[in-house]
UniProtKB/Swiss-Prot annotation:
It is an enzyme of class 6 (ligase). Keywords: ATP-binding, Cell cycle, Cell division, Cell shape, Cell wall biogenesis/degradation, Cytoplasm, Ligase, Nucleotide-binding, Peptidoglycan synthesis. It comes from Burkholderia lata (strain ATCC 17760 / DSM 23089 / LMG 22485 / NCIMB 9086 / R18194 / 383). This is UDP-N-acetylmuramate--L-alanine ligase. One of its GO terms (cellular component) is cytoplasm. Cell wall formation. ATP binds at residues 112-118. The keyword ATP-binding applies. Its main location: cytoplasm. The keyword Transmembrane does not apply. GO terms for molecular function: ATP binding; UDP-N-acetylmuramate-L-alanine ligase activity. Belongs to the MurCDEF family. Pathway: Cell wall biogenesis; peptidoglycan biosynthesis.
Length: 465
């Protein structure tokens, strides 16, 4: 590719999916430019690495580019897309560019409705501990690396495979992971769950004859597609028929202690430096891959015990002063689907038994809120106190029956929690100052702009002091 394409431009370079690919390309020696609507830590990092960053979208930004990379979130009338089309500069989907990177190495693609980012991070960390020095492209910041991407010298590239727009069907990895299959992004599949499951089957058909599908048999929908997978399958999970399974699971001090049982191998005692049964499952996927690739048990144990997590995945911000005196524990999480939220809430209950749980939640997308409305009501009703914001639209038109006010009314009707509704995330710090008490566990949660709230909460409490 490099002898033809030397300058690659990214429209929306600050996004989680785009920035990782851009960083790897910079490190491969390509000239990289990109644009986004605002600066953030990601664009600053890319600029420091040598990428040319423009704030705002303008036709002039693509000057000299041999290819323009877009995600499905980029509109067709974007001025840079229009300019590329007028100049006959190839417009490349993000997943297609990721597929090109996978052609340079042996790809390990992590798919599933939930858990992709954490599982990808765990796989990359365990392989790195085993001396395989993988390249990785992750949808969140791997805290130990301080970045969401890295160019390694080893043979493998570990990356997330995105089913939300069916773009994972562009990838041809040698190892695939399927964590779970759930009803999300159903617009892509015509609101037909059978089509979604069929897409995952087609994903496994991208494997070569020597490849393998590493699948979580705890998920009933994953279990249903196994008979239709024509390539070798490695089953992991908590189920008795899992080839890589966890037993004797014990949650202590925010960590998960368990024993790994693998066919033909001695039991392996593991301490995972993360809470939650769902993270035990994610770790089992990494253990299955690492075992297959010859990583030593000592390296597996070390990597999982020292895993520092991923940005916005149960990320701890420490203790924050409470208005009534004392302090509360502040955690931030990316969860935005009811299944993910339930797993995070369960992890928090397990990590902090007996403590009051306060959730500040920003729903993400009106269509998701509409499609999962009852499930949102059910999961939000399980917390002890709730601050709820208006829906983060993500470019969608508002739906009056699926907005924050409608969700608040439904929650009050159920009567298990009385939400404090705020119009914007800017109001969350004030709301939390009134709600959070000494000894509470406070979680800010959502895939939108609420990710900036924890830093503001800390600043807010300092100003009040």
């Amino acid at each position: 590719m490099k002898h033809i394409v030397k300058h690659i431009h990214f429209v929306g370079i600050g996004g989680a999916g785009m920035s990782g690919i851009a960083e790897v390309l910079v490190n491969l020696g390509y000239e990289v430019s990109g644009s986004d609507l605002s600066r953030n830590a990601v664009t600053d990092r890319l600029q420091a690495l040598g990428a040319r960053i423009a704030i705002g979208h303008d036709a002039v930004n693509i000057e000299g580019a041999n290819a323009v990379v877009v995600s499905t979130a980029v509109r067709s009338d974007n001025p840079e897309v229009l300019a590329a089309r007028a100049k006959r500069v190839p417009i490349v989907q993000r997943a297609v560019m990721l597929a090109e990177l996978m052609r340079l190495k042996q790809g390990i693609a992590i798919a599933g409705t939930h858990g992709k980012t954490t599982t990808t991070s765990l796989v990359a960390s365990v392989l790195a501990a085993g001396g395989l020095d993988p390249t990785f492209v992750i949808g969140g910041r791997l805290i130990s690396a301080g970045a969401n991407a890295r160019l390694g010298t080893g043979d493998f590239i570990v990356a997330e495979a995105d089913e939300s727009d069916a773009s994972f069907l562009n990838l041809y990895p040698v190892i695939e992971v399927i964590t779970n299959i759930d009803a999300d992004h159903m617009d892509t599949y015509g609101h037909d769950f059978a089509r979604l499951k069929q897409a995952f089957i087609e994903f496994t058909q991208r494997l070569p004859f020597y490849g393998s599908a590493v699948v979580c048999v705890d998920d009933p929908n994953v279990r249903q597609i196994i008979p239709f997978i024509s390539k070798p399958v490695v089953r992991y999970g908590l189920s008795p028929d899992a080839q890589v399974r966890a037993e004797d699971i014990d949650a202590r001090d925010g960590r998960m202690h368990f024993t790994v049982i693998r066919d033909g191998r001695a039991p392996l005692a593991v301490v995972l430096n993360m809470p939650g049964l769902h993270n035990v499952q994610n770790a089992l996927a990494a253990i299955a891959i690492a075992t297959d690739l010859g990583v030593s048990d000592d390296a597996i144990q070390l990597a999982l015990a020292e895993f520092n997590g991923v940005g916005r995945r149960f990320q701890r911000y420490g203790e924050v002063p409470a208005a009534d005196g004392g302090q509360y524990t502040l955690i931030d999480d990316y969860g935005h689907h009811p299944v993910e939220m339930a797993a995070t809430i369960a992890a928090a209950r397990g990590a902090f038994p007996g403590r009051r749980l306060v959730l500040a939640f920003q729903p993400h997308r009106y269509t998701r809120t509409r499609d999962c409305f009852d499930d949102f009501v059910n999961v939000l009703s399980t917390v002890d106190a709730l601050v709820l914001t208006e829906v983060y639209a993500a470019g969608e038109a508002a739906i009056s029956t699926a907005n924050g006010d409608a969700l608040s009314r439904a929650l009050r009707t159920v009567g298990k929690v009385d939400p404090v509704f705020v119009a914007t995330v800017d109001d969350v710090p004030d709301a939390l100052a009134k709600v959070a008490q000494n000894g509470d566990v406070v979680i800010t949660m959502g895939a939108g702009s609420i990710g900036g709230v924890p830093a503001k909460v800390a600043q807010h409490t300092q100003q009040k002091a």
